């Protein structure tokens, strides 16, 4: 028969699964709503630009594969997805490889930025030619298309500096997204490669930040929820002129107050015990946090002195009496033995051990011995 603890734990697990399913259903409904809005908007104008789609999808956590499916759904209902060429050309012209402020950077990274700056940008015709060759299995074309867009990765990675990952790591993660974009690019859809690759690069970087930037990993969907909560908090701060209450945030986000409090708790960054303290930073936070499990120095010293006095008093008994008391009260290993167990140790009856114990305790109660221990009992 299950005990109460098992029943309680089972109930908690069921509740946890129920909450998880509710969150999943809510996220799914939110995604479906956004897709429906895109379809309605696209049918009115006949087409959608990449930027319009990305602006709508920015609020939800979608993988690149899911984005591909949304493109297919839009095209299946007669909505053309087109590239905003003017916008992308401006973006490419604005790409810069300068190092962000406050970023310590060594010579190898400087050399990398210098090298990728030498690679010329591709024209739309060159991109189409390379894409066709990639489709036919040309590995050199794949390499050339990726190298020509490395500066795009650096430009995007700069926007995510200060979120818990090194600049070089952000570039590396963005490069992985770029490689994926090279493999998936379909020039027949009409937009430039940089338009298409931007999403993959951003997605790779944001997922890496979610997975690696925190000491305790938080799932990607929760990172998105935390970001949304932060945006709502900032908006309310500007409107109210003070820090918003959880109840006010919950109303805007359309979720229970307890859930908002839970998200706020999850969003807190852990603080290292090695955090430097003071102007000279010669102390650490851990130096000022007491160990609740460790005894106070005064108590530890008193216990040690009591132990020394107890050993001296036990030495005044006969060897047999001393050993019986040590076993009966577990003075050596913390495990008290029964009369039966001690009797087997000495090969005598329980009654005999009881008599030896009683005699030894009478001796310890004598004022000549007991007065030495009384001070430790106050």
UniProtKB/Swiss-Prot annotation:
Residues covered by region (Sigma-70 factor domain-3): 224-300
A Pfam family that the UniProt record links to this protein: Sigma70_r1_1
GO cellular component annotations of the record: cytoplasm
Location relative to the cell: Cytoplasm
Region annotation Sigma-70 factor domain-4: where it falls in the sequence: 313-366
Domain of life where this protein originates: Bacteria
Alphabetical UniProt keywords: Cytoplasm, DNA-binding, Sigma factor, Transcription, Transcription regulation
Signal peptide: none
Region (Sigma-70 factor domain-2): 145-215
Keyword Nucleus assigned: no
CDD domains: Sigma70_r4 (cd06171)
Coiled coil: none
Annotation: DNA-binding region: 339-358
Predominant subcellular localization, coarse grouping: cytoplasm
Motif Interaction with polymerase core subunit RpoC, residue numbers: 169-172
InterPro entries registered for this protein in UniProt: RNA_pol_sigma-70_dom, RNA_pol_sigma70, RNA_pol_sigma70_r1_2, RNA_pol_sigma70_r2, RNA_pol_sigma70_r3, RNA_pol_sigma70_r4, RNA_pol_sigma_70_r1_1, RNA_pol_sigma_70_r1_1_sf
Region named Disordered: 1-29
A GO term for molecular function: sigma factor activity
Any GO BP: DNA-templated transcription initiation
Stored NCBIfam families: PRK09210.1, RpoD_Cterm, sigma70-ECF
Family: Belongs to the sigma-70 factor family. RpoD/SigA subfamily.
Biological role stated in the UniProt entry: Sigma factors are initiation factors that promote the attachment of RNA polymerase to specific initiation sites and are then released. This sigma factor is the primary sigma factor during exponential growth.
Assembly and interaction partners: Interacts transiently with the RNA polymerase catalytic core.
Name this polypeptide is given: RNA polymerase sigma factor SigA
Species this protein is from: Clostridium acetobutylicum (strain ATCC 824 / DSM 792 / JCM 1419 / IAM 19013 / LMG 5710 / NBRC 13948 / NRRL B-527 / VKM B-1787 / 2291 / W)
């Amino acid at each position: 028969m299950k005990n109460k603890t098992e029943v309680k734990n089972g109930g908690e697990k069921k509740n946890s699964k129920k909450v998880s399913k509710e969150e999943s259903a809510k996220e799914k409904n939110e995604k479906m709503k956004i897709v429906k809005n895109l379809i309605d908007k696209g049918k009115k104008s006949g087409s959608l630009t990449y930027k319009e789609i990305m602006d709508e999808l920015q609020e939800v956590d979608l993988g690149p594969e899911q984005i591909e499916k949304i493109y297919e759904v839009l095209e299946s209902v007669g909505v053309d997805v087109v590239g905003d060429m003017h916008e992308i050309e401006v973006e490419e012209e604005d790409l810069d490889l300068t190092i962000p402020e406050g970023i310590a950077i060594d010579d190898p990274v400087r050399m990398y930025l210098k090298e990728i700056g030498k690679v010329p940008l591709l024209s739309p015709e060159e991109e189409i030619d390379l894409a066709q060759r990639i489709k036919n299995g040309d590995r050199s074309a794949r390499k050339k298309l990726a190298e020509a867009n490395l500066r795009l990765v650096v430009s995007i990675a700069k926007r995510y500096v200060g979120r818990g990952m090194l600049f070089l790591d952000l570039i590396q993660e963005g490069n992985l997204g770029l490689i994926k974009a090279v493999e998936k690019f379909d020039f027949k859809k009409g937009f430039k490669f940089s338009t298409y690759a931007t999403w993959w690069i951003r997605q790779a970087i944001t997922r890496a930040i979610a997975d690696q930037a925190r000491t305790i990993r938080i799932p990607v969907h929760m990172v998105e929820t935390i970001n949304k909560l932060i945006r709502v908090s900032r908006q309310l701060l500007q409107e109210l002129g003070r820090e918003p209450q959880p109840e006010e945030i919950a109303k805007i986000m359309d979720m229970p107050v307890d859930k908002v409090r839970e998200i706020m708790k999850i969003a807190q960054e852990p603080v290292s015990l090695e955090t430097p303290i003071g102007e000279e930073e010669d102390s650490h936070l851990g130096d000022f946090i007491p160990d609740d499990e460790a005894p106070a120095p005064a108590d530890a010293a008193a216990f040690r002195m009591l132990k020394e006095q107890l050993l001296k008093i036990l030495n005044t008994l006969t060897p047999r009496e001393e050993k019986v008391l040590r076993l009966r009260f577990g003075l050596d290993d913390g495990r008290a033995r029964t009369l039966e167990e001690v009797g087997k140790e000495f090969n005598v009856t329980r009654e005999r051990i009881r008599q030896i114990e009683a005699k030894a305790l009478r001796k310890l109660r004598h004022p000549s011995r007991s007065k030495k221990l009384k001070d430790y009992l106050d």
